[in-house]
């Protein structure tokens, strides 16, 4: 399998179509928010998009998983939260739009994303997990991510129920160092520009082990606004 940086408009359009299909399969029918303050299409346009393919001859239409990555120089932070100004914007990354259409494919494309981030001297990596409906929390927890602030509304997408609530999570410090080290040991080959990562057998990424006693760290307290929103949606 291989992970490719999607460089053409056609490839990136296929990514967006597959992302939408993955969300619809999970019954999360989101639409892009585009107004004077927020533009989800601009966010994706500024991001690097990566797609997973079963082999080097696979066309764009055969993309089976994907994810988006940007640093804060490429596009501003998408959700509010604790201060990160102690680090250069180019060293703080956001991972988003992580989707998969095949078992295990989501993990493989994330391995590709980890390799891309690890080679850029990262200081922090952010992700936003859907509150109450994300099946990725266990995976991100195993990678070393921890909650970062309280749940917030992700205003770049909306559904009939309004803006989705997400839990910001962050990878930093020792956990990030372990990810960088583990990424360098993954079995892959690439070109000089790192535009394509071809995986060899034995792909496995386990940089961080979370003690079961600390699992409670993911049981974050929600804001009153989130609780009120959930009560309103339940009564709708």
Place the predicted regions along the sequence by residue.
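Conserved N-terminal entry element of GNAT/NAT acetyltransferase domains
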Residues: 1-13, 197-208
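A conserved beta-strand-loop-helix scaffold within acyl/acetyltransferase catalytic domains
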Residues: 3-93, 99, 151
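C-terminal/domain-terminus segments
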Residues: 10, 117-123, 184-202, 226-228, ...
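Extended, composition-driven regions rather than compact fold-specific motifs
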Residues: 29-30, 45-46, 51, 62-63, ...
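Short, surface-exposed beta-strand/loop "edge" segments at domain boundaries and coil↔beta transitions
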Residues: 58-60, 137-138, 176-179
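Acyl-donor binding region in acyl/amide transferases
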Residues: 79-165
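C-terminal "cap" of GNAT-fold acetyltransferases
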Residues: 156-192, 199, 204-208, 214-215
């Amino acid at each position: 399998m291989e992970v490719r940086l999607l460089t053409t408009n056609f490839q990136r359009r296929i990514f967006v179509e597959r992302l939408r299909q993955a969300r619809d399969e999970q019954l999360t029918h989101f639409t892009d928010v585009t107004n004077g303050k927020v533009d989800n299409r601009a966010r994706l346009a500024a991001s690097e998009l990566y797609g997973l393919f079963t082999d080097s001859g696979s066309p764009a239409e055969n993309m089976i998983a994907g994810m988006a990555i940007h640093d804060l120089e490429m596009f501003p932070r998408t959700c509010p939260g604790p201060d990160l100004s102690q680090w250069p914007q180019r060293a703080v990354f956001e991972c988003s739009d992580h989707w998969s259409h095949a078992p295990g494919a989501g993990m493989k494309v994330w391995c590709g994303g980890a390799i891309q981030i690890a080679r850029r001297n990262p200081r922090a990596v952010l992700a936003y997990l859907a509150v109450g409906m994300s099946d990725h929390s266990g995976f991100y927890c195993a990678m070393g991510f921890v909650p970062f602030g309280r749940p917030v509304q992700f205003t770049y997408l909306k559904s009939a129920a309004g803006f989705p609530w997400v839990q910001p999570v962050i990878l930093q410090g020792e956990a990030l160092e372990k990810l960088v080290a583990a990424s360098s040991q993954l079995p892959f080959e690439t070109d000089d520009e790192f535009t394509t990562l071809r995986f060899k057998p034995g792909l496995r990424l386990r940089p961080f082990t979370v003690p079961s006693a600390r699992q409670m760290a993911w049981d974050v307290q929600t804001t009153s606004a989130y609780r009120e929103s959930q009560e309103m949606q339940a009564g709708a």
